[in-house]
């Protein structure tokens, strides 16, 4: 089997985890107590969903997941919630005091007290796997636990499981809406630390998702539940090919192979379509061509940036539901004729396509309409450098005055780490810039030194 272990870190990670596992259970027909009436092979078997769930002899399905937070309140909600019987109590790990939005606390002081326990639990999960494929790490950039503890964990996972792929789903600080003043510090420190340990990071920005909820679902005041349910649809689309049998399945390492042209340039944009409320869906026929087109609309992206200003390096379309390759090819042919979609000249306009026959499932009482087909597009585009540039700018403004730095230094960090992280991010921006430049003058020599 090709198992995946999900690791949910900090409040954002845990709450997205709740939404994802709720959706997985609905998709596979697993009840909140872990029983699965449709499963005939008790205690194992080679069903595709066993990549995400392990089975006990009694026929209970247990998620291959770990929830970690440095303070207990958020995970306590899981312990008392609807799905409390689904998780093994050892999978829900909490500390006593939180990281207080401070990367240094998550990474050094508080984080190191709990890291060995977490790795021990992950080791137990890994031992139950026959062919562990990799890890999915869910976290936010802005929080102390999400940034600090995740980067510590990624470093340790690289040591313990060197060859396994590690994919991140990161909540990127929204341009306008901020939940903490020190978000730019935490984000840049964590990106710098995890850059070499992460194979692929899908970024999601709350503001982009707020706008999608407002615009497409007519929710006036979206809550985190609305946001997380939308995020979970995307995560589900990305992982569907690991959990179901399909026509064109895509596996974890395949994403990396097709989306990451250079090791550092591993931040694909996710776009999902159709995001539509039940009232609207009733009057629209969402053909393959329509939903494919919708993916190239900046309005449907999960990060605020404009791909029309950047160039695409790679593109991966994951369809699910009633979709046949013929329709997909026609839709892609139409896309290629459009001038607004530019590829870098060193990359043939390749689209990787995955097709899965399992139609998208929706949470009952949720906001999304039940549709016959959906598509999730993962595209690696130079436009995402806009997002980094915005963040770097905020970082520089604060760091020029050394604002809030004493909180980090007081927890055992050195000031040099800030400038080091800043330089690394500047280099990342530069990398994106160079990748987008047309390779006319035979750029062989300068690429040699970077990679």
From Swiss-Prot:
<feature type="binding site">
    <location>
        <position position="206"/>
    </location>
    <ligand>
        <name>GTP</name>
    </ligand>
</feature>
<dbReference type="InterPro" id="IPR003008">
    <property type="entry name" value="Tubulin_FtsZ_GTPase"/>
</dbReference>
<feature type="binding site">
    <location>
        <position position="179"/>
    </location>
    <ligand>
        <name>GTP</name>
    </ligand>
</feature>
<dbReference type="InterPro" id="IPR018316">
    <property type="entry name" value="Tubulin/FtsZ_2-layer-sand-dom"/>
</dbReference>
<feature type="binding site">
    <location>
        <position position="10"/>
    </location>
    <ligand>
        <name>GTP</name>
    </ligand>
</feature>
<feature type="modified residue" description="N6-acetyllysine; alternate">
    <location>
        <position position="40"/>
    </location>
</feature>
<dbReference type="GO" id="GO:0005737">
    <property type="term" value="C:cytoplasm"/>
</dbReference>
<dbReference type="Pfam" id="PF03953">
    <property type="entry name" value="Tubulin_C"/>
</dbReference>
<feature type="modified residue" description="3'-nitrotyrosine">
    <location>
        <position position="451"/>
    </location>
</feature>
<feature type="modified residue" description="Phosphoserine">
    <location>
        <position position="439"/>
    </location>
</feature>
<dbReference type="GO" id="GO:0005525">
    <property type="term" value="F:GTP binding"/>
</dbReference>
<feature type="modified residue" description="3'-nitrotyrosine">
    <location>
        <position position="282"/>
    </location>
</feature>
<keyword id="KW-0493">Microtubule</keyword>
<feature type="binding site">
    <location>
        <position position="183"/>
    </location>
    <ligand>
        <name>GTP</name>
    </ligand>
</feature>
<dbReference type="GO" id="GO:0046872">
    <property type="term" value="F:metal ion binding"/>
</dbReference>
<feature type="modified residue" description="5-glutamyl polyglutamate">
    <location>
        <position position="445"/>
    </location>
</feature>
<dbReference type="InterPro" id="IPR002452">
    <property type="entry name" value="Alpha_tubulin"/>
</dbReference>
<keyword id="KW-0007">Acetylation</keyword>
<dbReference type="GO" id="GO:0000278">
    <property type="term" value="P:mitotic cell cycle"/>
</dbReference>
<dbReference type="GO" id="GO:0005874">
    <property type="term" value="C:microtubule"/>
</dbReference>
<keyword id="KW-0479">Metal-binding</keyword>
<dbReference type="InterPro" id="IPR037103">
    <property type="entry name" value="Tubulin/FtsZ-like_C"/>
</dbReference>
<keyword id="KW-0597">Phosphoprotein</keyword>
<feature type="binding site">
    <location>
        <position position="140"/>
    </location>
    <ligand>
        <name>GTP</name>
    </ligand>
</feature>
<feature type="binding site">
    <location>
        <position position="99"/>
    </location>
    <ligand>
        <name>GTP</name>
    </ligand>
</feature>
<feature type="short sequence motif" description="MREC motif">
    <location>
        <begin position="1"/>
        <end position="4"/>
    </location>
</feature>
<protein>
    <recommendedName>
        <fullName>Tubulin alpha-1B chain</fullName>
        <ecNumber>3.6.5.-</ecNumber>
    </recommendedName>
</protein>
<comment type="subunit">
    <text>Heterodimer of alpha- and beta-tubulin. A typical microtubule is a hollow water-filled tube with an outer diameter of 25 nm and an inner diameter of 15 nM. Alpha-beta heterodimers associate head-to-tail to form protofilaments running lengthwise along the microtubule wall with the beta-tubulin subunit facing the microtubule plus end conferring a structural polarity. Microtubules usually have 13 protofilaments but different protofilament numbers can be found in some organisms and specialized cells.</text>
</comment>
<keyword id="KW-0342">GTP-binding</keyword>
<keyword id="KW-0547">Nucleotide-binding</keyword>
<keyword id="KW-0488">Methylation</keyword>
<feature type="binding site">
    <location>
        <position position="15"/>
    </location>
    <ligand>
        <name>GTP</name>
    </ligand>
</feature>
<feature type="active site">
    <location>
        <position position="254"/>
    </location>
</feature>
<keyword id="KW-0206">Cytoskeleton</keyword>
<dbReference type="GO" id="GO:0003924">
    <property type="term" value="F:GTPase activity"/>
</dbReference>
<feature type="binding site">
    <location>
        <position position="71"/>
    </location>
    <ligand>
        <name>Mg(2+)</name>
    </ligand>
</feature>
<comment type="similarity">
    <text>Belongs to the tubulin family.</text>
</comment>
<keyword id="KW-0944">Nitration</keyword>
<keyword id="KW-1017">Isopeptide bond</keyword>
<feature type="site" description="Involved in polymerization">
    <location>
        <position position="451"/>
    </location>
</feature>
<dbReference type="Pfam" id="PF00091">
    <property type="entry name" value="Tubulin"/>
</dbReference>
<keyword id="KW-0963">Cytoplasm</keyword>
């Amino acid at each position: 089997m090709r198992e995946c272990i999900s690791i949910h870190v900090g409040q954002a990670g845990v709450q997205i985890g709740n939404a994802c596992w709720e959706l997985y259970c609905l998709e596979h027909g697993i009840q909140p107590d872990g029983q699965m009436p449709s499963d005939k092979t008790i205690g194992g078997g080679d069903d595709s969903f066993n990549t995400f769930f392990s089975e006990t002899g009694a026929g209970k399905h247990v998620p291959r997941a770990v929830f970690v937070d440095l303070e207990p309140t958020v995970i306590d909600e899981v312990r008392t919630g609807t799905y409390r019987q689904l998780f093994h109590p050892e999978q829900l790990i909490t500390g006593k005091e939180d990281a207080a939005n401070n990367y240094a606390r998550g990474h050094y002081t508080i984080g190191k007290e709990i890291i060995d326990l977490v790795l021990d639990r992950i080791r137990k999960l890994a031992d139950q796997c026959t062919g562990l494929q990799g890890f999915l790490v869910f976290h936010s950039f802005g929080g102390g636990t999400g940034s600090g503890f995740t980067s510590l964990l990624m470093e340790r996972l690289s040591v313990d499981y060197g060859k396994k792929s590690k994919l991140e789903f990161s909540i990127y600080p929204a341009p306008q809406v901020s939940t903490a003043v020190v978000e730019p510090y935490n984000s840049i420190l964590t990106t710098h630390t995890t850059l070499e340990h992460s194979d692929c990071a899908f970024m999601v920005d709350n503001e982009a998702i707020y706008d999608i909820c407002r615009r497409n679902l007519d929710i006036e005041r979206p809550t985190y539940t609305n946001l997380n349910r939308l995020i979970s649809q995307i995560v589900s689309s990305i992982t569907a090919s690991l959990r179901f049998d399909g026509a064109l399945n895509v596996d974890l390492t395949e994403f990396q192979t097709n989306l990451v042209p250079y090791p550092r340039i591993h931040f694909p944009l996710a776009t999902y379509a159709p995001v539509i409320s039940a009232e609207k869906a009733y009057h629209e026929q969402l053909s393959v061509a329509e939903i494919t087109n919708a993916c190239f609309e900046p309005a449907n992206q999960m990060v605020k940036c404009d791909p029309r200003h950047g160039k695409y390096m790679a593109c991966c379309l994951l369809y699910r539901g009633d979709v046949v390759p013929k329709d997909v090819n026609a839709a892609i042919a139409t896309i290629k004729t459009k001038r607004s979609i530019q590829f870098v000249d060193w990359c043939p306009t390749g689209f990787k396509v995955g097709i899965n026959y399992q139609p998208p499932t929706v949470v009952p009482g949720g906001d999304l309409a039940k549709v016959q087909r959906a598509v999730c597009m993962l595209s690696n585009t130079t436009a995402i450098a806009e997002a980094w540039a915005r963040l770097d700018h905020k970082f520089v403004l604060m760091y020029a005055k050394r604002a809030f730095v004493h909180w980090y230094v007081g927890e055992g960090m050195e000031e040099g780490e800030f400038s080091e992280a800043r330089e690394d991010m500047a280099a990342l921006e530069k990398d994106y810039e160079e990748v987008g430049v047309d390779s006319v003058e035979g750029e062989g020599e300068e690429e040699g030194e970077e990679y």
